[in-house]
Amino acid sequence: MRSLGANMAAALRAAGVLLRDPLVSSSWRVYQPWRWKSVAAAAAATTETAQHAQGAKPQVQPQKRKPKTGILMLNMGGPETLGDVHDFLLRLFLDRDLMTLPIQNKLAPFIAKRRTPKIQEQYRRIGGGSPIKIWTSKQGEGMVKLLDELSPNTAPHKYYIGFRYVHPLTEEAIEEMERDGLERAIAFTQYPQYSCSTTGSSLNAIYRYYNQVGRKPTMKWSTIDRWPTHHLLIQCFADHILKELDHFPLEKRSEVVILFSAHSLPMSVVNRGDPYPQEVSATVQKVMERLEYCNPYRLVWQSKVGPMPWLGPQTDESIKGLCERGRKNILLVPIAFTSDHIETLYELDIEYSQVLAKECGVENIRRAESLNGNPLFSKALADLVHSHIQSNELCSKQLTLSCPLCVNPVCRETKSFFTSQQL
C-alpha cells in the first residue's frame, strides 16, 4: 500500500502546471483588464458553441474547390468548457510519450478524476475554458488565405486542427483529411521549439494512427517539425516586447528585466538529448539581437513540480530573486507559447503577475501579449509552409536524429514513417 501511495504521489507530480494547487486570492482577479476581458470573451464564445458529441464534427471551412493540400496544425489543445477538463486530463495522463507511470491504465483515470475539480477552478478563473482552439482557427484561416496566393500550384489549401488531448483529436483530423482526398498533407507543429514530449508526441500519434488502422496513407506526408528562429516569428516576439515596454514608466523603462519564460523539462529528459533547451535559447538569442539588446534579460523556466531536478532557474524563483536584489520592474515573455492558454493566462497572469508580485513587492510587472491573432504571425505560418513546399524536403535534418539516449522505440518508427514518404 505504501508503494502504491508513493507511485500515485509521483504520478501527481508528473503533470506540470495542470496538477498544481495554487491558493489564489480572489481579490486579485483582474490585473491586466485589457487582456483579461478579450480572453474571457473568447473563452465565453467557445463555451457557448462547444459541441458535446462523442466525436468531433468535421472542421468546416468555406471551400469553392476540393482541397489539394492539407496543413495539420498540431498542438496539445485545451478544454473548451469546464465539462471537458476530465477527459483532457485523462488523455494527458494516458500519453506515454509525455510521461511513463506505473500501472498507467489504472492510475490515469484515478488521477484525472481526483484532479478535475481543482483544474476546473483554474479554467473558471480564466473565463471557463481554453481559447487555444479559437486562436488556432484564426491563425489557420489567415495562413491558408495567404498560401492560396503564394502557392497557387498547391492550392486550394485547407487547415486542420489536430490536438492531442481534446477534440478535434489528431486521429480525427487525419480521418477527415483522408476523406477529403488530399494530394499532400503537412504535419505542422505549433510548437516553435521541438521537444519529444510535445511535437514528438503529436508526430507519434500520426504514425500510430496508420499503424493501428493497418493501411498506408492515401496522401503524401511531410512535416514542419521545428522553427525556432524563423525571421517573422522573431519579429512578432520583438514587436510584442517593444509594445509592452512602452507601458512601463519612462524613467524605469531601460532597467526593466525581460524574463523569457518557457515550460521546463525534467533533467532526466534533457540528459537523454532532447533538443528543446537549445532551441528555446536560440529563439531568445535571435529576439534579443532584433531588439539590439535594449534591456537586461534572462531565460527562465516555469511549471516545475516535484523534488526531481528540472531545467532552471524557475520563473517564480527568478522573480523573487530579482526583487530581493532591487530589480522590481519585470516583463514576462512566454517564448515557447504562441497562443494563450492555461500557462499564460493562469500561471503567468495570475500566479506570478498578481499573487507573487504582491508578495515580493514588485513595482511593475507585465506580460508580453501572446501572438494569438497578430496578422504578422499568420504571415509567418504561411511563409513557413510555402518555404517547406518549395524545399521538397520531408522533414528537418534534426528529426532524422534520435536523442542519443532515447528510450522510446516509437520515436524511431515515427522518424522512419516520415523519411520514407515519397513527394
From Swiss-Prot:
It comes from the Eukaryota. The active site is at residues 230, 383. It is a peripheral membrane protein. It is found in: Mitochondrion inner membrane. [2Fe-2S] cluster binds at residues 196, 403, 406, 411. Protoporphyrin IX binds at residues 115, 123, 130. It catalyses: heme b + 2 H(+) = protoporphyrin IX + Fe(2+). Belongs to the ferrochelatase family. PANTHER family: FERROCHELATASE, FERROCHELATASE, MITOCHONDRIAL. Catalyzes the ferrous insertion into protoporphyrin IX and participates in the terminal step in the heme biosynthetic pathway. This is Ferrochelatase, mitochondrial. The gene is FECH.
